[in-house]
Structures are given as C-alpha cells and as structure tokens.
C-alpha cells in the first residue's frame, strides 16, 4: 500500500514539475519513467542521509546529513540554493498525511515525563530513551533469566547500577549481597592496599572467593532490590543477558564465577548490588579475579587489570567520581549477551585490581555472588580449573561475538597508540605507556556518548572489558600473546565496544600505579603475560630505535655518498675521458674504482672535511679544465649522442634504488655534467652501485645504441638509394626527351625555329602516353575522354592557343619539365601535373591503340570530339594535325607547326617519332579544318 501510494504522489509531483517548466502535457510512458527516476533518486538520498546519521551516532537524520548526502550525490548546495531562489516553489496540490501509520511501541520504554527521566545522567545522550527506575529494573531482571535483549532491560541496568553503586559505596553490608564487585574496593581501599590484596589473594584463591564478583548481570541486579538472594543474583545475571550478547556469556560466567559468586551474592544480598561492596569484597573479588585474570587477561597482572578497569572509571569504582556514571552504563552492558562471560572475567579482573573487580561485579549478576558464597572453598581449589573452563567458554563466545564486532581486531591489538582499537594495547605495554593513558581518555570521552548497543556506554564498557578480557586472555594464552588487551575487549564483543573506551583512561592511570604491585603477583600466567608484554614492548622500542638509527644512518650515508660522489665525480671527470679513449667499452671502470676506494666508513668526519675542501678545489679545476675540454666534449657528444640521451633518462630517477640506477649517468658523454648530478645522485647511490650488473647493463645499453645506429644507417642508406634511383630515372627521362627533340628537329626543322618550346614538345610525348590520367585531369567539361576509335583526319581548326598549352602537356612527364611549364603561362590545365605523376610511373612510350580512344570523346549529340594531348583541350576549330601512327590529333601550335606540311609526308607525334624512326608507316593523315 505504502509503495503504490507514494508512487502516485511522486507521479503528481513529476507532473507539477513538468508543468512548472512549461510543458502542457506529458506522455504516460515518459511520466512513468520520470517517476521511477525520482523514486530512485529520493531513495538514494534517504539512504545516504541515514548512513551519515548512523555514522555520527544518530538514529534520525538531520540537515547536516542531508547536506552530506547531496554532496555525495554530486549536488552542490550553493547551486541548489541559487536554484531555489530563482525558481518559484510549487506546492503540492493537497495535504499529504504522514505514512506509514506509526505503530505502538512494544519496547515499553518509560515516558519522558516519568520519574526516571529526571535521573538521566550527563553521560547518557538525549537520543537514548528514558531509563526504568532501579526497582523496576531489578524486577525485570529477575524475570528474564534468559538474558532477554529488550532495549528496556538494557537501559534499566544503567541507572540502577549507578544508584546501587552509590548505595554500595555507602554501605559495606551490601558488599556480601549482590555487590561483590570491585568498585567499592577500588574506592575504599588505597591503591597500595589493593595490590596487596591482589597479591595475597592471587596467592590464595580462597580470598578471592570471599569477595565473589557479580557477573555483569549481577550489576543489573544491583538495580534490582539489594535483597536479591544468590539465586536471585543468578536470575539477575540471566536478566543481564537480556541484551543479546549476555545470554551466551552468561553460562560461561556462571561456570567461571560460581565459586567466587557465592561470596559476592552474600555481600550483594542487601541493596549492595552496587559495586561499592565493602573493601573486603573487593579483596575477595580480586582473588577470584586473579584466576580469571589469569584466564581472561593473562597479560595483565591482576593488579593491572583492576587498575585498568578502575581507570576506565566504570562507575562502580568509588575512587573515581566518573565510576558511578560508568556503573549506570555497566548495568546496561550486563544486558548484553556477553555480560555473563564478563562476569567470570570480572571476577578475575577483581583479583587483578579492585576497581576492575568493581566494574566487573556490576557486570556479574547476583548469581555469581551466590555461587561464590556457596562455593568459596570449592572456588579456591577449583578456581584454576574453572578459570580454564571459563576461558574456553569465553574464547568460544568471543569467537562467536567477535564476528559481529567490527571493532575488535581493528580497535585492539594492532596499533599501540590506539586504545580504542584493541584491548591488547591497553592491557599490555600501552597501559604503562602514555599512549594508553591518552587512549583511555579518549575512551572516557567516547563513553560519555553511549553506544547504541549498550544502554549506557560506561556500563557496556565494563561488561565488554570483562568478557573481552577473558576472551583476550584465553586467546593470548593459546597464541602466547599478552592478555593486557582484555580491558578493551568489550569493544570487540559488541558494537558498543567503542563507547566503553572511556574506561581505559582510568585504567591506564591505575594500571600505571598498580603495575609495580602486580609484580608481586606470583602466578605463572600473569608473570608470563607480563614478561611477554615487556618483551613485546622492548622489541617495539628496539625496532623503533633501530628505525630511528637506520633513518639517521641513512641520512648520514646519503650525506657521505653525496660528498663522495661529488669528489669522485670531480676527480674522475677527466680521467674518464682518457679511459674512454683507451677503453671505450668500459668507460665506468675508473668511476667504479673511485667509488670503491671512497667508502662511507673511511669518509667519516675527516672524510667530510676533506671532501668539502676537495670539492672547492675540484670546482676551480673544473672551471679551468672545462674551457680546455669543451672541444673534446663536443666531439664526444657528437659520437655519444645516443649515450647521452640514455644517460639523461637514468639521471632523473634518483628515487630508484641505488642498485637499479644505471652507470650510464657517468658515461663519458655526460662526464662534464657529472659534478652537477652527483650531489643529487649520491644519496641514492650506494657503494655497491658500481658492480658487474651495472657493467652488464652498460654493455647492453651500448649494444642497443649500436643496433639503433645500425638501423638508422640502414634506413639512411635505403633513403639515399631511393633518391639515387629517382635521380637516375629523371636523368633517363630527360635524355629520352632530348632524343625526342633531336628527332623532331630532324623530321621537322620548321618547328624549331618558330617556337622555342620544342623541348617541351618531347614532354608532351610523355604526357600523351598516359591518356587516361590526362583525360581525367582535363579542365574543360568536354575534355572527358570517351572511347571512340573513329577520328577525322582534320579536326576543325581553331586559333592557335599560344605555346603555353604545349608546355603543359610535356610538363607532366618529367618533374624538371613540370617546373619549366609552371614558369610559363600554359600551366592552366590541371591535367598536366596529374599526367606527370602517371607518366613517371608508366613507361614513357607504351600505348598506341589506347591513345586513340583516350583523346576522342562523343558529345551529347553523338559527334566525335578530339582532344589535343599536348594541351588537353578539345578541338576548338583551330588547325590540327593527326599522327599517322597513334591517331592522336594535335593543335599546330602545340606541336610547333606553323604551316601545313605536304600531304605526301607522314607526320608522327612526339611519342611515335621516337618509336618509329626507321619504320615506314601508312599514309600521313593531315586535314585542316
């Protein structure tokens, strides 16, 4: 329904737009297409808006998101603004109701005006729904043991945790109930006492059991009435799972925490669900936490873990005012499925550090506390086994959870400076390093804005740190990598991982303070983790130092190499020329020797000083020698032009590895340039630059040059041969023309005297050969050749057209004659040049019968028209003479005839005259029209 309705509205809007643009009507198909385009466009725009809003942590787009979406689609906001100002807006014809109809909210969030709305903490963003009161949340948590994922359950734990945390901090009695988390210990016990408790508890698991830690769900239960029994605590842990992740973690958390949890539940039993249980609890939780710390965060010593957790200020630790806020979020995190796992990890972390334990207690449900109270003796003995089992479970869960969490790996292990990215960094060397502290601060800031996954950012952070630490410890134990990453792991476990980052700041500071105390902890896992972390840190430091040293050494080497190259270039400049004369094959040998002699080691301080002095001297020498060697260089340049070109190409790529650089840079041709090039090249060129490989390359280059030269020479020779052939052909043609002229002179002495164009007549003969080409070129419309074998003996005589036309016909045959013809006025006919090209290709005298048809055309009325091969003009009535052999008719002036020859005498055209000197022909045909 919605789609069809929206499409109908879009169709109306398309019609309105078309109407506004001046269209009176639109075809239905065009309207459908435009509607489809508009629909897709709006969908793309809306999709971009939502993606940008989600990218910036909002659920609904704002104008900024719309602007970003427009820019993404290539729409300029300034142009759009101008468009809106210049075009009148068209209002929709009728009012559009909001659709689809909104449905009732099933999430059961409290109304904004309810009592909980006033208790919204500063760190809770406004876009998050109101939080249920702590009592209501406790009731809800009791009911959902399965770890429901309702947003309500998620949110309720946050505020309840904060309230409970404050209560626990005030009352130590609550410590035995549900508030066995380490936040109370962290606040109440001084930093020194915590490490002691941790170390003592680390030694004895029983102490840890005493302060059983509540799973993350137990933190949620804190908001539930403090009177929750241990069983109730378990339920609350189940409730904490209401968030999707907690249910998976809950089983592991219960298995890991059962021994430690009974104590915690006892302390929690009163309203002490908050982590502010008595310091005794904290001490207990640290003990239990130590084993989990071993499992979950082997890298961190129990103390470090507690410090990290405290530092994050997960709101459960009374020490930091931020901790209460964090606790509020922590209850929400218990809702996440991972919270149960976090609970065991929380117990472990409590052993490690009281603050960490407090945070984790919130995460662990009262169940853990009950289990701890019941199983205190068992947990001391079984703590290690349970830890291992919990580790396995945590690992499995972490694997399952990590898949959805894009932040885990990216945020965690790989960048030391980024605490957000990986818990490993925080847990490991980074906790001690200022980077970790900075990252922790960043996390606290991010925590202030709760992530969508976690009801409260800090609470989710705590829960994440618990589960993440356990998962990380297990993973590290398997991989042998430090487990300090666990505190940041919450990010890995769920999308809310990023918000928990605020905790790391406190954790980093606390870890720094507690790290020495963690040394006291004797457990092997912790020690191994610490040693691993230290080793890693040392290795990183060493690598950094090495990198720095390498950079420094590289810079020094570059400077040295530059100086060396300059010196060697100057020293070897002239020797090169000598060597090249003697050994042109290996022009670089001298250079190689020079570089080998000058080693960076030898060229240290003394070398640098000497080099500078030598450079100045070399410069002077170069200037003096430069003048003398200009002549030599010019000669070499002429010889080595190819080399220089190649050398120039390698010189610019100074970036290439020195080994790859080609020696050609130092070729004799470029020897003069070498001093200028050396300073830039030296840093790039290593001592090994001049090796056999380079020699081979040089040889290959030389070969290539030689081959290229040979090819060029061959091409030149070919060209020269062709030119010579052309010249020969031209000479032959000229000779033939001269022969024709002589023959004509003998046959017709009259022609020579009247017109000086007789030599051109011979050219005409050549032109007459290719009648086809000439016919095409004939400028006169009648000049088109028509096949006809009949020819009147005397075409109608016409006034002599002047000797010019005669020149044109001969000109086509030889190129030089063409030039002469051009000088004369007879160049008018364009056929001349075309004929010349054709004549050059074809034999000079080749066609007898073809010529007949070529120069005879039939007009529209069927009359035959003869074309003069000499001038390529049709019969114009002027006197013409016909060749007794080829039947071509020439104007008298074109052939140099002034008076009619006797009829008994045969007359041959210039073409035939040469062919038939000694032959007798039929009667001469001569007619004057």
Curated annotation (Swiss-Prot):
Positions with biased composition (Polar residues): 340-358, 434-466
Assembly with partners or alone: Component of the TFIID basal transcription factor complex, composed of TATA-box-binding protein TBP, and a number of TBP-associated factors (TAFs), including TAF1, TAF2, TAF3, TAF4, TAF5, TAF6, TAF7, TAF8, TAF9, TAF10, TAF11, TAF12 and TAF13. Interacts with TAF10 via the histone fold. Interacts with TAF13, TBP, SAP130 and GCN5L2. Interacts with TBPL2.
Binding site for Zn(2+) 1: 868, 871, 891, 894
Protein name (record): Transcription initiation factor TFIID subunit 3
Xref: Gene3D superfamilies: Histone, subunit A, Zinc/RING finger domain, C3HC4 (zinc finger)
GN (gene name): TAF3
List of residues that carry Phosphothreonine: 501
Alphabetized SMART domains for the sequence: BTP, PHD
Biological role: The TFIID basal transcription factor complex plays a major role in the initiation of RNA polymerase II (Pol II)-dependent transcription. TFIID recognizes and binds promoters with or without a TATA box via its subunit TBP, a TATA-box-binding protein, and promotes assembly of the pre-initiation complex (PIC). The TFIID complex consists of TBP and TBP-associated factors (TAFs), including TAF1, TAF2, TAF3, TAF4, TAF5, TAF6, TAF7, TAF8, TAF9, TAF10, TAF11, TAF12 and TAF13. The TFIID complex structure can be divided into 3 modules TFIID-A, TFIID-B, and TFIID-C.
SUPFAM superfamilies per record: FYVE/PHD zinc finger
Native species: Homo sapiens (Human)
